[in-house]
Amino acid sequence: MANYTAADVKRLRELTGSGMMACKNALADADGDFDKAVEQLRIKGAKDVGKRAERTTAEGLVVAKDGVMIEINCETDFVAKNDEFIKLADEIVTVAAAGKPADLDALKALELDGKTIDTVIAEQSAKIGEKLELSRVASFDGPVAVYLHKRSSDLPPAVGVLIEYTGEGDAAAEAARGAAMQVAALKAKYVTRDEVPAEIVASERHIAEETARAEGKPEQALPKIIEGRVNGFFKDVVLTEQSSVTDSKKTVKAILDEAGVTIKRFVRFEVGASA
């Protein structure tokens, strides 16, 4: 008896882009363990693993002010570019910038015109005729850099990056904003490789090894091949190890070092994408 369901097969197909039989076989080989099945399909060369999971399903905008960034969602792009919706987002982020909420619940509890933001959202939702939802908030101290990106000229920003850094002067501010643009474009997840969880590195190393073996690489060449592929993974997900989008001859770290900037932390919001 199969230890997986048709829903598991459907989900695996949507996530990996693999064929039905490949997904069934992967689930069977993994004894129904979904994560192991995904890993097996990656090793076998399945394309776009994880990328489909990032597809956005909601509309809305990202807005930032004075070290605070929020994402507020709606159902359609028609509402996303509605003046009242944009005004509401601006009013909420202004309150958030003053209150510096630690999390989403704290943001919703702040007051705007004598009402909690949660209540204001509900009232505006009824007025506009679509479900509105505050989905994320980030609040940083110290010097910050912000970059907001529009997917379309007629829509408000749908991608936002907030970076907290140390450094002084215009050169430092410019370098930090460049790093924010970098995160918006290439979706780094960590500042340095030391921040990457050990289990993720181990998984990537395992995938690199199994893929190399499946490709028939000579045994004596495996250590170098594995190390190269793991380093490639780090360049994909670690901000300071990426080649700069503004100067491909330099790493982001080199540009930041030249400006005397150290990135403390960052967050990237994309409308509709999971946190």
Swiss-Prot record:
Role noted for this protein: Associates with the EF-Tu.GDP complex and induces the exchange of GDP to GTP. It remains bound to the aminoacyl-tRNA.EF-Tu.GTP complex up to the GTP hydrolysis stage on the ribosome.
Name by which UniProt lists this protein: Elongation factor Ts
Localization of this protein: Cytoplasm
GO molecular function, a single term: translation elongation factor activity
Region (Involved in Mg(2+) ion dislocation from EF-Tu): 76-79
Gene3D superfamilies according to UniProt: 1.10.286.20, DNA helicase RuvA subunit, C-terminal domain, Elongation factor Ts, dimerisation domain
Species assigned in the record: Rhodococcus erythropolis (strain PR4 / NBRC 100887)
Protein family per UniProt: Belongs to the EF-Ts family.
UniProtKB keywords: Cytoplasm, Elongation factor, Protein biosynthesis
Pfam families in the record: EF_TS (PF00889)
